[in-house]
Swiss-Prot record:
The keyword Nucleotide-binding applies. Residues 8-283 form the tr-type G domain. It is found in: Cytoplasm. SUPFAM superfamilies: EF-G C-terminal domain-like (SSF54980), P-loop containing nucleoside triphosphate hydrolases (SSF52540), Ribosomal protein S5 domain 2-like (SSF54211), Translation proteins (SSF50447). One of its GO terms (cellular component) is cytoplasm. The lineage of its organism: Bacteria, Pseudomonadati, Thermodesulfobacteriota, Desulfuromonadia, Geobacterales. GO terms for molecular function: GTP binding; GTPase activity; translation elongation factor activity. GTP binds at residues 17-24, 81-85, 135-138. This is Elongation factor G. It comes from Trichlorobacter lovleyi (strain ATCC BAA-1151 / DSM 17278 / SZ). Catalyzes the GTP-dependent ribosomal translocation step during translation elongation. During this step, the ribosome changes from the pre-translocational (PRE) to the post-translocational (POST) state as the newly formed A-site-bound peptidyl-tRNA and P-site-bound deacylated tRNA move to the P and E sites, respectively. Catalyzes the coordinated movement of the two tRNA molecules, the mRNA and conformational changes in the ribosome. Keywords: Cytoplasm, Elongation factor, GTP-binding, Nucleotide-binding, Protein biosynthesis.
């Protein structure tokens, strides 16, 4: 079976935007006009085809990026709908990694909103060509030109309008096409399916000519042949203009801007035309690079004759077919039922079935080709970011980077019977979402889950209940404290028991001191001379001390960074045993800790906040109030970057506070840096709380 549409007719695009810019509605309309759905799904009625997880319909936000295929002007368009909430940046990041281009949706009233800045930076990172769609032109306060200006100012991009709106707010009825110099007007009755072309209204003609000149000037500045023609006063043909816009868009020299109102069904067909005309096909973007088994860099071109290579970019659990692995095929062909090699894990996998996804319907296909996006059933080992390829021509494609989780909570099942289900459901969710981790706390035996933010964990707990029917209680976010000492002391540990028959006798002298530099951990030195403590008992002393480090003397937290030297002791021919020396070591160490100035340590996080200039003051003030230290400032892409060190204990609720303090325009990244002593007043409070 040969491929249905040639590679140059493929468009793999994402739709990215701020939370309420109308992303899902735009995707819905695209599916409606390309003939995939027969009834328009409205987000605020909770029936959108793309938002198919129950929570998404309730909350009206898109959480998981659904992949959908549709056809327009005999081109095949694969669309990935991405979430706009800051806790889900991982979803956006992984979709951008496998796309060739993106449509950025902006609200004509709000313009460039906070999340758009974050998503835009992510798209810059992967060099994804973009088209801007200024949506909601029918809203009160809609302003197309302000939107264009904000793309320039806030995102430091080069927006070039290809259309102008005809009328605005309630009177928005069509657009002026600056390439063809025609007006396109929609009629209200046919849900936007019917529109007609007419001459540009007289009151818009001068403005249209002015913007068309700007467009031609911009594209010819990147093309010498056009520049000559333009400067020589010759008219450029429509085909020349379109070819130049296409090449400038693919090289990210310009961002073409179109407009419309998805909700009112206007402008969506022209957006689709722009995707087909100006977005790259898999052939237009640089061949993907990877590393072969010898460690050398190799390229895989988008071609069916090249060896097969693909990247798994999303795992989903589907109630009917089980686990789906979404893959983007970069080169070669893959048949269902065949074997592939997971180069990242070094495992062979069998592809059960291959599905083409239409939002939440699925169509079974026999094979996928270079440039395709499809879902595979039956992969056991593949997780997000893994490379699939031919075993004899193995390659590892550059993977997706995942941020470290920043918040943890303890979770326990409400009933005994849920215990096993809890473990299984958490494992499944963790395999779908690499930014979510599960571990068991050795000290308390609790299950601890960690993620990218409070909303992220809320949704995970919610999904456990809905999809796996597991009811769970969730604790408060927790901090992992440690204990250490500050002085060097010499102590005696003596354990003597005499009660008829054989007694117990263990006796040691220890020097207990802090390590010269933090992070060195526990160290045991044997300095016994002349056999005052026999050889065979020394490991027991060490073991006793090590066990005692599990529970500190202040509040029972693990003791770190101590050096213990065994300097002296005595033994009894009959009564001494390993057990006695183990207890003596542990007693001596505990007493040593009491005398050696014990202190609490807390995890200090390195926090980087990217914030627009005007909110700098609030952000710095807030970090200081959280016992933070500002380490430096720096400007990046029109925003300020504040680096600081802040105790983890003071960072709970931060994403919510930061969002409200900066109207959501700031983003932050937090990573663990080091442990540091807790100030006395704070540590007294913690100890009192623990001892209750």
């Amino acid at each position: 079976m040969s491929r249905l549409s040639p590679l140059d007719k493929y468009r793999n695009i994402g739709i990215m935007a701020h939370i309420d810019a109308g992303k899902t509605t735009t995707t819905e309309r695209i599916l409606y006009y390309t003939g995939v759905s027969h009834k328009i799904g409205e987000v605020h009625e909770g029936t959108a085809t793309m938002d198919w997880m129950e929570q998404e319909q309730e909350r009206g936000i898109t959480i998981t990026s659904a992949a959908t295929t549709c056809e327009w002007n005999d081109h095949r368009i694969n669309i990935i709908d991405t979430p706009g909430h800051v806790d889900f940046t991982i979803e956006v990041e992984r979709s951008l990694r496998v796309l060739d281009g993106a449509v950025a949706v902006f609200c004509s009233v709000g313009g460039v909103e906070p999340q758009s800045e974050t998503v835009w930076r992510q798209a810059d990172k992967y060099r994804v060509p973009r088209i801007a769609f200024i949506n909601k032109m029918d809203r009160i306060g809609a302003d197309f030109f302000r939107g264009v200006q904000m793309i320039k100012d806030r995102l430091k991009a080069n927006p070039v309008p290809l259309q102008l709106p005809v009328g605005k707010e309630d009177y928005f009825k069509g657009i002026v096409d600056l390439v063809r110099m025609k007006a396109i007007i929609w009629d209200e009755e046919s849900l936007g399916a019917k529109f007609h072309e007419e001459e540009i209204p007289a009151d818009l003609l001068d403005e249209a000519k002015e913007w068309r000149d700007k467009l031609i000037e911009e594209i010819s500045s990147h093309d010498d042949a056009l520049m000559e023609k333009y400067l020589g006063g010759e008219e450029l043909t429509e085909a020349e203009i379109m070819a130049a816009i296409r090449s400038c868009t693919i090289n990210i020299q310009i961002i073409p801007v179109v407009c419309g109102s998805s909700f009112k069904n206007k402008g969506v067909q022209n957006l689709l035309d722009a995707v087909v005309d100006y977005m790259p096909s898999p052939l237009d973007i640089p061949a993907i690079k990877g590393i072969d088994e010898s460690g050398a860099e190799v390229e895989r071109k988008a071609d069916d004759t090249e060896p097969f290579s693909a990247l798994g970019f999303k795992i989903m659990t589907d109630p009917f077919v089980g686990q789906l692995t979404f893959i983007r095929v970069y080169s070669g062909v893959l048949q269902s039922g065949s074997y592939v090699y997971n180069a990242t894990k070094g495992k062979r996998e069998r592809i059960g079935r291959l599905l083409k996804m239409h939002a939440n319907k699925r169509e079974e296909i026999k094979e996928v080709y270079a440039g395709d996006i499809a879902a595979a059933v039956g992969l056991k080992y593949t997780t997000t970011g893994d490379t699939l390829c031919n075993e004899d021509q193995a390659v590892i494609l550059e993977s997706i980077e995942f941020p470290e989780p920043v918040i943890s909570i303890a979770i326990e099942p409400k009933t005994k019977s849920d215990q096993e289900k809890l473990g299984l459901s958490l494992q499944k969710l963790a395999s779908e979402d690499p930014s979510f981790r599960v571990k068991t706390d050795e000290e308390t035996g609790q299950t601890i889950i960690s993620g990218m933010g409070e909303l992220h964990l809320e949704i995970i707990v919610d999904r456990m209940m809905r999809e796996f029917k597991v009811e769970a209680n969730v604790g408060k976010p927790q901090v992992a404290y440690r204990e250490t000492i500050t002085k060097k002391v010499k102590v005696e540990g003596k354990f003597v028991r005499q009660s008829g028959g054989r007694g117990q006798y263990g006796h040691v002298w220890l020097e207990v001191e802090p390590q010269p530099e933090p992070g060195k951990g526990y160290e045991f030195v044997d300095a016994i001379k002349g056999g005052v403590v026999p050889r065979e008992y020394i490991p027991a002393v060490d073991k006793g001390i090590q066990e005692a480090t599990d529970n500190g003397v202040l509040a029972g937290f693990p003791v770190v960074d101590v050096k213990v030297t065994l300097i002296d002791g005595s033994y009894h021919e009959v009564d001494s045993s390993e057990m006695a020396f183990k207890i003596a070591g542990s007693m001596g160490f505990k007493e040593g800790c009491q005398k050696a100035g014990p202190i609490l340590l807390e995890p200090i996080m390195s926090v980087e906040v990217v914030v627009p200039e005007e909110y700098m003051g609030e952000v710095i003030g807030d970090l200081n109030s959280r016992r933070g230290r500002i380490m430096g400032m720096d400007s990046r892409a029109g925003a300020q970057v504040v680096s600081s060190m802040v105790p983890l204990a003071n960072m709970f609720g931060y994403s919510t506070d930061l969002r409200s303090a900066t109207q959501g325009r700031a983003t932050y990244a937090m990573t663990f840096d080091h442990y540091e002593p807790v100030p006395k007043s704070v540590s007294d409070e913690i100890i009192a709380k623990v001892k209750g």
